[in-house]
From Swiss-Prot:
Organism: Xenopus laevis
PROSITE patterns found in the cross-reference section: ZINC_FINGER_C2H2_1, ZINC_FINGER_C2H2_2
Subcellular location: Nucleus
Family named by the database record: Belongs to the krueppel C2H2-type zinc-finger protein family.
GO cellular component, one term: nucleus
Pfam assignment, any one: zf-C2H2_4
SMART domains in the cross-refs: ZnF_C2H2
GO molecular function: DNA-binding transcription factor activity, RNA polymerase II-specific; RNA polymerase II cis-regulatory region sequence-specific DNA binding; zinc ion binding
Protein name as catalogued: Oocyte zinc finger protein XlCOF19
Signal peptide range: none
């Protein structure tokens, strides 16, 4: 077995490489320093961002045997299978609500703690997740990166564009 001289001070898990420890520690802090330049998503590790970028490139070599939907990596396919099985392995210790994704549980738990760890540098308003902060920040910058293909009107987030599309 490989020697693992780098322990996590938070949970004790040990790693063979310092970089692996550094990557792991973001699971405790919730830090997501790697941003996708094409959309409003952030990731805790460069490998997560690289996997996500495959979506923008259209690389999806792993098909679901039940519905045919394709995925950029096996782990995404395995998570997708929960749609068919109904599995929700992450449960809230406060209220018992269950989630398919750990990140959804983490964001949900902030509704109980009222924690808002992401603050706007312009006005100080706090948010429970980074993507909400990103969208809010556009109210200050005026950025509207989502445009309607029918009329050209711009929107600060994808959901507003989706609602707008229904008017055409």
């Amino acid at each position: 077995t490989e020697e693992k001289p780098f322990p996590c001070s938070e949970c004790g898990k040990r790693f063979a490489r310092r970089q692996h420890l550094t990557d792991h520690q973001s699971s405790h802090t919730g830090e997501k320093p790697y941003a996708c330049s094409q959309c409003e998503k952030y990731f805790p590790h460069r490998s997560n961002l690289n996997r996500h970028l495959k979506l923008h490139k259209g690389e999806k070599p792993f098909p679901c045997s039940q519905c045919g939907k394709r995925f950029p990596c096996v782990s995404d396919l395995n998570i997708h299978r929960r749609v068919h099985t109904g599995e929700r392995p992450y449960s809230c210790s406060e209220c018992g609500k269950c989630f398919k994704h750990h990140s959804n549980l983490t964001n949900h738990q902030r509704t109980h703690t009222r924690e808002k760890p992401f603050s706007c540098t312009e006005c100080g308003k706090g948010f429970k997740d980074r993507s909400s902060l990103t969208v809010h920040h556009r109210t200050h910058t005026g950025e509207k990166p989502f445009s309607c293909t029918e009329c050209g009107k711009g929107f600060k987030d994808r959901s507003s564009l989706t609602v707008h599309h229904r008017t055409h």
